[in-house]
Amino acid sequence: MTTLSSQAAPAVNAVIERLQAWPGEHRVAVGLSGGVDSSLTAALLRDAQWQVEGLTLWLMSGKGACCAEGLVDAAGLCEELEIPHHVVDSRDTFQQEIVQFLVQGYGDGITPLPCSRCNRAVKFGPMLDWAEKERGITRVATGHYARLRPNADGGRTQLLRGLDARKDQSYFLYDLPQAVLQRLIFPLGELTKPDTRAEAARLGLRTAEKPESQDLCLADHHGSMKAFLDAYLPERPGEIVLTDGRVVGQHDGIEHFTIGQRKGLGVAWSEPLHVVRLDGAMNQVVVAPRAEAARGDAVVGAVNWVSIDPPAEPLDVEVQVRYRSAPERARLTPLPPVESDHQAERPHRCRLDFAEEQFSITPGQAAVFYDGEVCLGGGLIQA
């Protein structure tokens, strides 16, 4: 068994000890993006004497973290760690599941959330399938800041927030099915980002000082989100209107606006105006004073109950309506399923009644439900 390092932080040694005590076969494929988080994940598993193989999904051609730079860094890391490295060409899947999804959503006047969809449709399930089919490996580890709590009786594995509140990524993982969740490992869920940086530097990993991407991978790839949308959507100028229909300005495409936006409207008015609705059918951006942008409820569809069975009765939850937003108290009431839901395998819906009015509830974004540190599930805001 590996001797724990006196130079590593206690939290790092605790992670290695847990990995060493993990039940079952100690073989794992690590999803490598070429960043420091996935790099340290591979190194920790190696130091815990797991048989580790690196697996990188090739999502886009060209520059950027998901492309050439990420592939080179991932390959170099595997060479340093002396582990095999595999590249899986997932460009077609990414184009169909993410690029087309985003283009359709923005064109329809919603603000899509690609990351949770990518985790479900492009990354975790496909990585597990490839690893088992091609390498006989049944587990995948990634550098996500989240935790898992297995059920000793064979029930649901629970998804928990990462200990580093500033880096917690459970919001983007709510949509994973149990069959996937039960085969994942998140070693960094017990660490903070400074812990990760420090241990990567101590180990001399080539990615230790690599900066994080500050934007959506597609925005990073194209230079900006506007550049990405301009590349796929034709210019569609239209009107900016008040809720009573009065025209107060012009826009160059509703895809460049989001609910709650105040800056960049190009509208002079007696008080600040905020975007309260995007009307895809009329190609209009609807604006109003801040008070009219607040609301006390929301309908959420395509709900995935990740840590509990679908509830039959109302329950009190904490809700995040955006990744960086603070959890808000709400009463969740299950609604009858709708067969026409865009994701038929997840017909569950619910209504959220917030304890306090919320600003910028945005159709297309995820509402994720929590009970303390446990992520109960989530879905897409529909209205």
Curated annotation (Swiss-Prot):
Enzyme class (EC, first level): transferase
UniProt main location, coarse? cytoplasm
- Give the location in the cell: Cytoplasm
For this chain, the family text in UniProt reads:
Belongs to the MnmA/TRMU family.
In short, the EC number is 2.8.1.13
CDD domains reported in the protein's UniProt record:
MnmA_TRMU-like
The record ties this protein, via PANTHER family, to: MITOCHONDRIAL TRNA-SPECIFIC 2-THIOURIDYLASE 1, TRNA 5-METHYLAMINOMETHYL-2-THIOURIDYLATE -METHYLTRANSFERASE
Protein name per the record: tRNA-specific 2-thiouridylase MnmA
Query: Where exactly is the site Interaction with tRNA?
Result: H144, Q365
Question: Which cystines does this chain contain?
Answer: C118-C217
Identify the GO cellular component terms for this protein: cytoplasm
Q: Which residues form the active site?
A: C118 (nucleophile), C217 (cysteine persulfide intermediate)
Q: Which parts of this chain are annotated as the region Interaction with tRNA? A: 167-169, 322-323
> One MF term from GO for this chain?
tRNA binding
Gene Ontology biological process terms from the UniProt entry: tRNA wobble position uridine thiolation
Q: What does this protein do?
A: Catalyzes the 2-thiolation of uridine at the wobble position (U34) of tRNA, leading to the formation of s(2)U34.
- Native source species: Synechococcus sp. (strain RCC307)
Identify the residues that bind ATP.
Answer: G31, L32, S33, G34, G35, V36, D37, S38, L57, G143
Catalysed conversion reaction: S-sulfanyl-L-cysteinyl-[protein] + uridine(34) in tRNA + AH2 + ATP = 2-thiouridine(34) in tRNA + L-cysteinyl-[protein] + A + AMP + diphosphate + H(+)
State the source organism's domain of life: Bacteria
Q: What keywords are assigned to this protein?
A: ATP-binding, Cytoplasm, Disulfide bond, Nucleotide-binding, RNA-binding, Transferase, tRNA processing, tRNA-binding
Keyword Heme (UniProt): no
Pfam families linked to this entry: tRNA_Me_trans (PF03054), tRNA_Me_trans_C (PF20258), tRNA_Me_trans_M (PF20259)
